[in-house]
Amino acid sequence: MFTLKKSLLLLFFLGTINLSLCEEERDADEEERRDDPDEMNVEVEKRFLPLVGKILSGLIGK
């Protein structure tokens, strides 16, 4: 019983460390993405182009 508790505790500890490292890496990637102006422009274009397409198709269709 004691060895089972030890191994479960070890798995929990390793899983917690792995999860925290993944969160830190994801946060760093998000900060890096926000700081890079080229990628910000690409994100704006991705949001802007479909909107323009819908507006133009609405105007042409009428």
Curated annotation (Swiss-Prot):
Species annotation: Odorrana versabilis
Signal listed as a keyword: yes
Domain of life: Eukaryota
Swiss-Prot/TrEMBL keywords: Amidation, Amphibian defense peptide, Antibiotic, Antimicrobial, Cleavage on pair of basic residues, Secreted, Signal
Stated role: Antimicrobial peptide.
Main location as per UniProt: secreted
Subcellular location(s) per record: Secreted
Family named by the database record: Belongs to the frog skin active peptide (FSAP) family. Temporin subfamily.
Residue numbers of Isoleucine amide PTMs: I60
Residues cleaved off as propeptide: 23-45
Distribution of this protein across tissues and organs: Expressed by the skin glands.
Listed GO CC annotations: extracellular region
UniProt GO BP: defense response to Gram-negative bacterium; defense response to Gram-positive bacterium
Record protein name field: Temporin-1V
Signal peptide per UniProt: 1-22
InterPro entries: Frog_antimicrobial_propeptide
